[in-house]
Amino acid sequence: MTETKEEKVHKVFEKISPSYDRMNSVISFKLHVKWRKETMKLMRVQKGTNVLDVCCGTADWSIMMAEEIGPEGHVTGLDFSENMLKVGREKVKEADLHNVELIHGNAMELPFPDNSFDYVTIGFGLRNVPDYMQVLREMYRVLKPGGQLACIDTSQPNIPGWKQVFNAYFRYVMPVFGKFFAKSYKEYSWLQESTREFPGMARLAEMFQEAGFSYVRYISHSGGASATHFGFKKKEQ
């Protein structure tokens, strides 16, 4: 029987969870931290707010948001991989944060009422879901009117030369890094496939608008290796 994308992705992240953080830094040359900081600066996150971090993984962004909003705010991190959440919970404990809750759940059907969160974030997760539009609509649904979505993910560079280097790196080098550092050649081969198939920046911005978001914009990082898209849920008239 053919394995669904959801089943395949779940299997990948359950296996690579122990080495995920180290591999993130190896693959991106630690640039993922810089990209997240650039995004946070542009978000202008307010203290004491309510945040949902979708596909939170090992909770890097959940922790950054929790530190930014302060003890009066609250962050809920959601992921469908229990093994990734286990790593994340240890990191939250080490950071001594009491305003973070990590829960098991599916981004395709967020277990929250409409209009629940001031901010929704998703970092390097959208490309791995079975249906991009379904997840975008779900994130729109749970945002409060006036709330903001920020999505960081890999993208498609269009600079001649750099595009070819980027594609070759993800296709040939990244799986080898996965084998060497994490004994996971097959899993990192899959991750480069999901990167290659993910929509480019302009198309993803259109999808944000189709899902209902307003004031959509995006910035590229490192020559288009990744991008952050921002969108707002319009305030009720």
From Swiss-Prot:
Q: Which residues bind S-adenosyl-L-methionine?
A: T58, D79, N106, A107
What EC number(s) does this enzyme carry? 2.1.1.163
Keywords, A to Z, come to: Menaquinone biosynthesis, Methyltransferase, S-adenosyl-L-methionine, Transferase
Q: Which Gene3D superfamilies match?
A: Vaccinia Virus protein VP39
Instruction: Look at the named UniProt entry and state the broad enzyme category this protein falls under.
Output: transferase
HAMAP family attached to this UniProt entry: MenG_UbiE_methyltr
Q: What is this protein called?
A: Demethylmenaquinone methyltransferase
Organism of origin: Listeria monocytogenes serovar 1/2a (strain ATCC BAA-679 / EGD-e)
Q: Tell me the name of the encoding gene.
A: menG
